[in-house]
Amino acid sequence: FLGSDLVSSPDDVEKDLEIRLPDDFALFVDPAINLGDPDIRDVLTYLKHRGMTKRDMWYFKFGVSIYNGFRRRVIFPSYDAEGNLNFYTGRDIDGDRFPKYLNASVDKKQMVFNELFIDWTEELTLVEGPFDLVKCNDNATCLLGSFLARDSLLFLKIIEHKTPILLALDPDA
């Protein structure tokens, strides 16, 4: 019937907006992760070749999924200021798939990547992507690209808090 897909309450709207990692998402630091799966081993090897440490994997909650288009991708979750998942991206490890990054269906301008770790009163380092972010010291976030829009939540918070910023973009930006 025509109206059967309409939302019946405000709680339903919130559920629809909730961001969820892939159902089989597993953290690399989870002892139960299936390291016997060759694709999971390849993702782990890729991370190690990129210079990621076990501490990085724990701190940034790197994970993996073997279903829903995320096979052979490292998944980077992001959390808002309250610790709720607000975004995730899955980076292809082979370099031959399009898109290179498979993102959650979220408007990137309406979230701040890993805001949970940001102190708006201190200098904030802005980098392009999650791998760049891992190599930063404390108080950094990534743009998920090379552009900061004036109407993005990140830009508005920087202005609101008068946060000093340090740009560390790739040479091709």
PLM feature spans:
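Non-catalytic accessory segments of DNA primases and related replication-initiation nucleases
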Residues: 1-55, 59-64, 68-73, 84-85, ...
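Phosphate-handling DNA/RNA-contact segment within nucleic-acid enzymes
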Residues: 67-163
